[in-house]
Amino acid sequence: MAEETSNDNLVVQGNEIVPSNGEALAEEVQGDELVLAEDLIQGDEVQGNELVSAEMSIPPTSRRRRKKSLVWEHFTIEAVSGGATRACCKLCKQTFAYSSGSKIAGTSHLKRHITLGSCPKIKNQEHKLLLTPAGGTDNDGEGTVERPSKRRYRYTGYANAAFDQERSCSYLAKMIILHDYPLHIVQQPAFTTFIDSLQPRFRVVDVETMEWEVYAVYQKEKENLMQAFNTMPGRISLAIGLWTTSQTLGYVSLAGQFIDSEWKMHRRMLNFMMVSSPHSENALSEAISTSLSDWNMKDKLFTITLDNDCSSHDIYSANLRDYLSNKNNLMLKGQLFVVRCYAHILNAVAQDVIASIHGVIYNIRESIKFIKASPSCEEKFAEIALQLEIPSTKTLCLDVTTQWNTTYLMLLAALDYKQAFSTLETSDDNYNEAPSAEDWKKVEAACNYLKLLYDSAHSIMAAANPTSNLFFHEAWKLQLELSNATGREDPVFSSIAKDMHERFDKYWKDCNLVLAIAVVMDPRFKMKLVEFSYSKIYGVEAAKYVKVVDDAVHELYNEYVAQPLPLTPAYVEQGGGNNAPASENSTQATAPSTGDGLVDFDMYLSEIATSQPTKSELEQYLDESLTPRIQEFDILNWWKLNTLKYPTLSKMARDILAIPMSMVSSGNSIFSAGTGTRMLDDYRSSSRPEIVEALVCAKDWLQYLPATPEAPSTALVKVDAA
């Protein structure tokens, strides 16, 4: 809301100045500055943000006009020797050059003196000049400080806006939250000195008060998010992460993913709770139930996505499903309820590849360290590569051991220079780490398979907010490639492929149903891609697996028909409230007409409608031709445009497309997900659990808000005073 600051007959609204009686003032904006029209006279002009007087010749016989520039309320003109004059500040008595002979200097330097804090009297008495009546006593006890009787300078921006301690504390709390600053920054001397230089009136609070401010921000943003959830038209899916601290405390993060009434995807952190044992399904179930109750969404849970990859995943998931099914109405008997993180499985498979050749990778790391140890050695290696006419333009670099993509890129670059490594070993007695020919074959095989994982991860990263339908494409191609690779005759390639396929095949069996249902909701593919891909993977048994998917899609759709979600205002606006009984609709459609002699025809139509029921939305959707595949296709926008055509099926699509198939989908985090339980930093883990939750959740929420309010004008304007 625009901030208002009143002064006598003028009021500042936002960045504008208007009279309190609503009448317009004659004013003019020049550059970034608002200047009253009466002050723009003769030689005064606005240049940039400054009001200056243009140089002019004064004929000695001309009548001198009264000076109306604002600065002359603060300066007097005094004659000095040689016919020159100087401008003298009325407050500090400092003088400035003004005229010499027939030339008059500009007034910009005079204006800077009174507006930028150069005048010591104005600097010391700024507050008193704004608030005390004329005739007040200055802080030095030197008597009355002269105050302009009619007008004074003031900025319209925040620099001179009314100071608000509470608002400033709230902004400080948001800064701490967004930038992960420690709460005790408010006690650091350098910080307090900096704040004092900006606003001496700001009272720096203690750590306990700042904790309260952080929690207040958290509560306010939580209320706003709660209102959004109250109008959410569909269900919500949870992405669950496990955390620990250096004190071995356990935390669970719960992020909700959903599609709003405008068919926009959102993911918001809901809770960050401390639990006794995060790896226990009972503790995790309690955390989920608490979160759903806290957000009033007990009947809206659709799926949960876990990033664990333990051997007891089936038992873990079954126990979790059984516990929550007693308190929540799980769709499709809970078959889709527990989803495993795709990014995690990619990382787990990649780690299997790296582990299979860890000895070779160690030698390559040591070789690169040797080459990079000195400029002379690096230059020698470059000369060898040039002599061998190696065409590669890749640069040797060390990897980050926690990010498998960097290991892949390191191996890929080293593979191009394998001859150079061997030549360096024969020409330098200090180097003996060159991999053998068999080692390089292992590296080649590893790079071949790591490329599959690398490309799959980048395909997911290409989408800003990947919907669940995108993951089927990556998963089925990877399943097919690894399945075929296990039959390769080369033992080096086949042995690595077998380890990879064993792990990924477990993921495929657990998740291929939810992946397939998601791609059916893509109008570019529907059941056709499922049929095609399953024929490649399962061969003659494909029809059996296709039927499983088809039956599940129809069963899930029937659940949406029989048990629609509670209507929300957003859904009603989209035309989803037409749930009149079929018999009533058919009666209205076939009501006998009168007076046209076609009563028998109407009865015939009624009989046809009874004997030949119309297709369901799902059957109509599946029977229609596929939507053309284009690069810029937006699946959420397609369903938004077809909501009225498929009112029930669109509800099903909204929930399915919002399933978080991956805990992470962007940045380097996708290459390091699932490397173990994540560690909470010492700063946060030392805080109380409720403050930790406030810091983590509020940071997630605030990043979706505008960073700063619109910056106001900093123009100097004239304000009348009594």
From Swiss-Prot:
Pfam families: Dimer_Tnp_hAT (PF05699), hAT-like_RNase-H (PF14372). GO terms for cellular component: nucleus. Residues 617-702 are annotated as: HATC (Hobo-Ac-Tam3) domain. GO terms for biological process: post-embryonic development. Keywords: DNA-binding, Metal-binding, Nucleus, Transcription, Transcription regulation, Zinc, Zinc-finger. A zinc finger (BED-type) spans 66-126. Disruption phenotype: Reduced plant size and amount of seeds. One of its GO terms (molecular function) is protein dimerization activity. Homodimer. PANTHER family: ZINC FINGER BED DOMAIN-CONTAINING PROTEIN 39, ZINC FINGER BED DOMAIN-CONTAINING PROTEIN 4. This is Zinc finger BED domain-containing protein RICESLEEPER 1. It comes from Oryza sativa subsp. japonica (Rice).
